[in-house]
């Protein structure tokens, strides 16, 4: 199976069902009154965190995510059924962006639910619209429009420990020994083509280790697996830097790989590292280890031989110890663009601007909501919309801008109106 960690999807929540205009018609009930039911709510779309998911394959090949519309209301005060919501399981570490590359949400915990798009509210039938002043309304509301937009999703794997190193240093073998992960293992470069997650158990505690594909020089430029997998390192609490003691210069390999991390994101070097000096059963490895320990001060260096299971228990306890010391070392959305609204930033009810065609264009969140639930084929509903505009001051502002004298037309959403006093 391919490892997919990015996807772009078109999202469309369901529209609300329309309310209905209906009147009770029964024998011996001369004043039956309105009995039109409300429309059902449109389906919403949610992402839910699932720890067993490990990539975005479902989202990659399901380009369009569309929820159903709510049912229309019926007579005899019968309400339309709400549409079913859509719940999509995504792996932990999934980040959601809008097309402006602003982060709009992320999934970090198993079972965590994130609202992606809200369904439209159901329109009210004339039974619900009856008031003391208007006990027999001859209109009903249309259902609200469900949210619709494109999103980009990106997966940055959540793991306590990230295994890094050049190809064929033994990362996949290590994770298969110390955890329940079973990656494919062979003695040639780029064996690991996708990250593997394994659960490691130490006494009564456990933690997650990620086997990340091997890096090569200029990985930050996209060479080899490149940036595609460097980003997954950002979410690991600590790093296990594995080097091959059978190579001629293990120290140079360590320095080169750290340079790749630095160029990609200098904050990666701030993460705690354990250096595993692997293949200590090779002739000459002990001499190289002594040189390594002289050059790298204040570093946790653990010599191992996966062939002989040397020091693996010590390694597991050391990883657990460092994880506990670095509980807060999990970067979330460092470059997020969440918008914070204050009382000073409160938006006006509407704005009016003149476009190139000479139309007075009226915009406002409240106006748009009222517009989309109004049935303009119904005279009474249209009249109610006009009263609403007058009540919030649109008519007065239009007169100030000269619409009465210039006889310009007014545009609200996708509809053009004439100004009549």
Curated annotation (Swiss-Prot):
Record InterPro entries: G_OBG (IPR031167), GTP-bd (IPR006073), GTP-bd_Obg/CgtA (IPR014100), GTP-bd_prot_GTP1/OBG_C_sf (IPR036346), GTP1-OBG_CS (IPR006074), GTP1_OBG_dom (IPR006169), GTP1_OBG_dom_sf (IPR036726), OBG_GTPase (IPR045086)
Give binding positions for GTP.
165-172, 190-194, 211-214, 278-281, 305-307
How this chain assembles, per its entry, is: Monomer.
The lineage's top-level taxon is Bacteria
Entries under Pfam families matching the protein: DUF1967, GTP1_OBG, MMR_HSR1
The cofactors it requires, by name, are: Mg(2+)
- Give the protein name, as stated in the record: GTPase Obg
Q: Which positions are annotated as binding Mg(2+)?
A: 172, 192
**Subcellular localization(s) per the UniProt record:** Cytoplasm
What keywords does the record list, in alphabetical order? Cytoplasm, GTP-binding, Hydrolase, Magnesium, Metal-binding, Nucleotide-binding
What EC class does the entry list? hydrolase
What are the residue boundaries of the OCT domain, all occurrences included? Answer: 342-421
GO terms under biological process: ribosome biogenesis
Q: Which PROSITE patterns match?
A: G_OBG, GTP1_OBG, OBG, OCT
